[in-house]
Amino acid sequence: MAPYEVTLGSIHFKAKADQRHLNPLGGVHGGFAATVLDSVTGCAVHTMLEAGVGYGTIDLNIKMCRPIPQNKELIAIGTVINMSKNLGISEGKIIDEEGKLYAHATATCMIIRA
């Protein structure tokens, strides 16, 4: 997984599931999508924070729309929906180059100020 576009309130990653991400039945484990979506939703919130301010995911809701393919580069996009003093709410999606949706998530992050 690697970021390739970052703007205020948004981040794009490229991600590819390989053999390490397979479940016992041979398909890509849902935990792969969960990890990718947790990362992009959190990183989107992170783009809105001042230096020295942290965050932690307190809620992650994932909808699997279709099986994640193995060995295909996918795009993961995280976007902030709402920011307040204590919470950041964001959404994420995993799509392919044609825009086909594989998974969608919403996340709530607690803002941690020192």
Where are these regions (language model features)?
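Hydrophobic/aromatic beta-strand elements that line small-molecule binding cavities or substrate pockets
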Residues: M1-A2, I62, G92, T108
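Catalytic strand-loop segment that frames the active site of acyl-thioester-processing enzymes
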Residues: M1-V28
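Conserved beta-strand segments that form the floor/walls of ligand-binding pockets within enzyme
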Residues: H12, K16, G27, T57-K63, ...
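Active-site helix/loop of acyl-thioester processing domains in fatty-acid/polyketide metabolism
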Residues: G31-A51
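Hydrophobic beta-strand-centered segment that forms part of the acyl-chain substrate-binding groove
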Residues: A44-I75
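HotDog/MaoC-like acyl-thioester-processing domains
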Residues: I68-A114
